[in-house]
A protein has these predicted regions:
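ABC ATPase C-loop
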Residues: 125, 149-150
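Conserved ABC ATPase "signature" region
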Residues: 110-128
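ABC ATPase NBD coupling module
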Residues: 67-80, 109, 183
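The feature captures the beta-strand-to-loop junction immediately N-terminal to the Walker
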Residues: 36-38
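Helix-to-loop junction immediately C-terminal to a conserved catalytic motif
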Residues: 51
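Conserved signature/switch motifs of ABC ATPase nucleotide-binding domains
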Residues: 131, 152, 184
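Conserved ABC ATPase signature
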Residues: 132-136, 140
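Catalytic Walker B motif of ABC-type/P-loop ATPase nucleotide-binding domains
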Residues: 157-160
């Protein structure tokens, strides 16, 4: 399993001011790191940099001490991102969205079928496996995106506000599943504005006013 490090990074979207300055954080195997802050504080920006979607304006993002390249490079290293907007293909079924992703990252069709079923079941989605994404509710879509991320079994799992549309029972279940990923050995980074969800994590990094402050180092 791998260690993710952000080293003194300034992060800015193209042509814009830095959203975050001088961020340093490490997420190691077996732990869940909560990244908290209000809307617009930079949670998605930080996870985008960790996922290889946003090159730092300065500083570095490292996987096991080696510089992280673009998103393709991150995927090849086992960095899985569950995006805030779910990123699902509306014209595919829930099961197809997951199976396609597993096969695209090297899984066999048989393995994809097995992992898909194993990921959908604990999220209460077995009955929706063959429904199109556009037919699912917002909460069901969010859970499908989570299932896809879990099915990929990454070394690093980045979860961006993945409980925002879920009720209390499903939020608790998702946190249990993230904990299971950490127990498997993954480094899990969970961006959330939910204090209860953050409290269930091992450490908490809070973003505010362009800076990152440790609440629980």
């Amino acid at each position: 399993m791998k260690t993710l490090t952000v080293d003194d990074a300034d992060l800015a979207w193209e042509g814009g001011r830095p959203v975050l300055k001088g961020v340093s954080v490490t997420a190691g195997p077996g732990e869940i790191l909560a990244v908290t802050g209000t809307s617009g504080a930079g949670k998605t920006t930080l996870l985008s940099a960790m996922a290889g979607l946003l090159p730092p304006a300065s500083g570095r993002v490292l996987i096991d001490g080696s510089p992280l390249g673009d998103r393709d490079h991150a995927v090849s290293l086992g960095v899985v991102l569950i995006p805030q907007d779910n990123g699902l293909a509306a014209i595919l079924t829930a099961a197809e969205n997951i199976s396609v992703a597993v096969i695209a990252t090297g899984g066999t069709p048989a393995e994809a079928r097995r992992r898909t079923a194993e990921a959908l079941d604990p999220l209460g989605l077995s009955g929706q496996a063959n429904q199109l994404i556009e037919e699912l509710s917002g909460g069901q879509q969010q859970r499908t995106a989570i299932a896809r991320g879990l099915a990929l079994r990454g070394d690093v799992l980045l979860a961006d506000e993945v409980t925002s549309e879920l009720d209390a029972a499903n939020r608790e279940r998702v946190i249990e599943l993230l904990r299971a990923e950490a127990t498997r050995g993954a480094a899990v980074v969970f961006a959330t504005h939910d204090p209860e969800a953050a409290a269930a994590c091992d450490r908490e990094l809070h973003l505010a006013d362009g800076s990152a402050l440790w609440v629980r180092p």
